[in-house]
């Protein structure tokens, strides 16, 4: 081989060696490449998104009351077999699918399994087994966003999208590298919570009483002086952690009955009484033969029982339909409708941005020009539909001395760590609807309903109460028998009202426990410090 060829060969070898050295130097000094290489040996697992909780008026949690557990599973561990009894059906199916996986994963388990030698992490369980105010609070979708109720209305406040993450150094087979431990990295920011006006103790007492006494219906309890709602119950309930089962369940469990519109019946009669007192017609007296006839149409009192000579007090105590038809004629449709509108009938209410109660139906003035329509309207039937929330607002106005306080459900956002109030969310408003003297007279009249009239079952064990019964026809039938809505709306104590309470049982033939009797039990619970 000539010297020239040898030199060329050595030159080529030298250049190749130099290229290798340069490449090695570049690999060692290039941090981006090093980071990418390291990332290929790190598994990052995301825990469920953090979400702010709901709190009651005293700062007690209404959601996030318990914990659930996530077990960290690595390929090649016998933890799969150990975890199988602690997983639900979906989790067991996942264990089977992932038995030959090459990556770690998190598995929902029913309890802390760290005693089995498996790494386990606690995460908040959003809803308890017996959740409180589930129709009001609502539920989440599969992505952790609010799908209904206040969860949906306040999703922008409660959901941040931030998640805690687990960083695991793993081998090519997805197993944890020897000598390393998973690192839990906390989210950068915490979500805000929301304080509601509900009282957890009162809500729980009302829900327990409803479960014992009602098949379908609702309960509302309001603080008279502020309009703040302390309890909002709707039956039947549902499991917020498994909403799918309730979508087609009987009784429409996802429906919040407190915000839905129903035939009102005689619970509407205090509206006419207020209009009469304001117009100076509170002394109107009528002889009741047990019915009222108009243009060939007969409007009967309950059981067609004659009530004799009755004034406003006796008409409320006996719930005399004929009296209120005649009183309505004396007042005129415009006066009665105006009072109903001032008390909130015919208008929906914003519970929170994006969550609104039904408006119900307040018949138009033109409709009430028809004498038959107006006659039905005067005792709460016909086209009139009202929500329990509207009825509560009306009764609370009487209890509060003639001042209408908008019923409130939401107070403010709070710091999840300290409980400190951050941003007010309540938009309270108050307005005078009728004179204080009118309210005082109505309070005495409605106390008479409980003491002497159709509402005697509403009498509490201690003290006195006031209110009005209502049995509303629905036009719906079951096995040939008409379904009715059974109401009691009132306040307690009668002398110095503190609580306004509405009990409504819908679509019943005859409830096992009357709404008035449930009202009395609620008064007793409140008196005992519920």
Language-model segments: what does each one mean?
Residues 1-243, 337-342, 460, 477, ...:
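Periplasmic/cell-envelope proteins involved in peptidoglycan metabolism and beta-lactam response
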């Amino acid at each position: 081989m000539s010297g020239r060829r040898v030199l060329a060969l050595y030159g080529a070898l030298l250049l190749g060696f130099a290229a290798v050295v340069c490449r090695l130097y570049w690999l060692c000094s290039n941090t981006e490449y090093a980071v990418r290489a390291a990332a290929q040996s790190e598994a990052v697992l995301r825990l469920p998104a953090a979400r702010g909780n709901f709190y009651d008026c005293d700062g007690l949690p209404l959601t996030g009351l318990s914990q659930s557990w996530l077990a960290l599973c690595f390929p090649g561990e016998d933890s799969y077999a150990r975890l199988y009894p602690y997983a639900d059906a979906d989790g067991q199916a996942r264990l089977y699918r992932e038995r030959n996986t090459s990556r770690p994963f998190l598995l929902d388990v029913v309890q802390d399994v760290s005693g089995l030698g498996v790494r386990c992490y606690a995460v908040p369980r959003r809803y308890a087994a017996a959740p409180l105010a589930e129709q009001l609070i609502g539920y989440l979708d599969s992505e952790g966003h609010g799908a209904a109720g206040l969860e949906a209305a306040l999703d922008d406040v409660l959901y941040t999208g931030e998640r805690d993450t687990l960083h695991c150094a793993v081998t090519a087979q997805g197993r944890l590298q020897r000598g390393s431990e998973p690192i839990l990295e906390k989210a950068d920011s915490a979500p805000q919570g929301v304080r509601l006006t509900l009282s957890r103790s009162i809500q729980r007492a009302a829900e327990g009483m409803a479960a014992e006494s009602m098949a379908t219906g609702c309960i509302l309890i309001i603080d008279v002086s502020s309009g703040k709602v302390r309890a909002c119950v709707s039956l039947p309930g549902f499991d917020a952690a498994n909403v799918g089962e309730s979508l087609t369940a009987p009784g429409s469990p996802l429906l919040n009955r407190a915000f839905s519109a129903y035939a009102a019946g005689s619970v509407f009669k205090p509206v006419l009484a207020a209009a009469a007192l304001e117009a100076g017609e509170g002394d109107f007296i009528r002889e009741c033969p047990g019915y009222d006839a108009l243009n060939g149409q007969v409007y009967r009192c309950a059981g067609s029982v004659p009530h004799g000579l009755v004034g406003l007090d006796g008409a409320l105590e006996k719930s005399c339909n004929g009296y209120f038809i005649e009183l309505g004629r004396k007042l005129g449709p415009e006066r009665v409708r105006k009072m109903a509108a001032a008390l909130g009938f015919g208008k929906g209410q914003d519970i929170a941005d994006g969550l609104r109660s039904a408006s119900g139906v307040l018949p138009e003035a033109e409709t009430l020009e028809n004498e038959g329509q107006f006659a039905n309207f005067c005792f709460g039937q016909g086209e009139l539909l009202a929500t329990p929330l509207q009825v509560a607002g009306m009764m609370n106005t009487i209890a509060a001395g003639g001042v209408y306080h908008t019923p409130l459900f939401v107070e403010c956002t709070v710091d999840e760590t300290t409980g400190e109030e951050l941003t007010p969310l309540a938009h309270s408003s108050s307005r005078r609807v009728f004179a204080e003297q009118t309210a005082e007279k109505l309070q005495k009249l409605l106390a008479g309903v409980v003491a002497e009239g159709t509402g005697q079952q509403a009498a509490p064990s201690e003290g006195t109460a006031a209110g009005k019964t209502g049995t509303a026809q629905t036009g719906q039938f079951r096995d040939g028998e008409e379904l009715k809505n059974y109401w009691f709306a009132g306040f307690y104590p009668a002398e110095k009202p503190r609580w306004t309470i509405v009990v409504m049982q819908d679509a019943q033939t005859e409830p096992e426990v009357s709404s008035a009797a449930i009202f009395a039990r609620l008064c007793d619970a409140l008196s005992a410090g519920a």
